[in-house]
């Protein structure tokens, strides 16, 4: 298996310097995502919306930077994550959306719709083969993600 390329940026912002959303767009270009044909295609942007009451998630304006990039390249973006199998604020699509909104992820703040990828109860998924998987032979992927 080929090693993945990992791109880094300095999280510090200096006076009159680029902020993180601008740096994120530069990373997207460096990674070659602009070379993909996104024109007219649904683009699932997978991220973690955070649990209710915590701060361990990316800020919504970072998601918006990716959304703007996808739109500028003709794509139809939506933010997505799948429900959890454990109890909490993301165990079904309704509570998951309320959690996302509470943490600042709304269509107005991120610039695109938010879809929970595996449906209302987390049962709308597709089995996808894991090619070359030594221990795992298939993965369940949310249908909305697969449809994109």
In which residue ranges do the predicted regions lie?
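N-terminal and secondary-structure boundary signal
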Residues: 1-148
């Amino acid at each position: 298996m080929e090693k993945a390329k990992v791109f880094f940026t300095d999280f510090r912002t200096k006076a009159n310097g680029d902020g993180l959303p601008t740096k994120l767009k530069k990373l997207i270009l460096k990674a070659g995502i602009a070379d993909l044909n996104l024109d007219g295609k649904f683009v699932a942007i997978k991220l973690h919306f955070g649990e209710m009451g915590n701060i361990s998630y990316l800020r919504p304006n970072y998601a918006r930077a990716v959304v703007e990039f996808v739109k500028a390249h003709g794509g139809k973006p939506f933010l997505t994550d799948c429900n959890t199998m454990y109890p909490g604020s993301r165990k079904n699509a309704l509570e998951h959306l309320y959690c996302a909104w509470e943490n600042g992820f709304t269509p107005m703040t991120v610039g695109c719709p938010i879809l929970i990828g595996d449906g209302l109860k987390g049962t709308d998924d597709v089995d996808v083969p894991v090619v070359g998987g030594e221990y795992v032979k298939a993965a369940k992927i949310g249908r909305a993600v697969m449809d994109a």
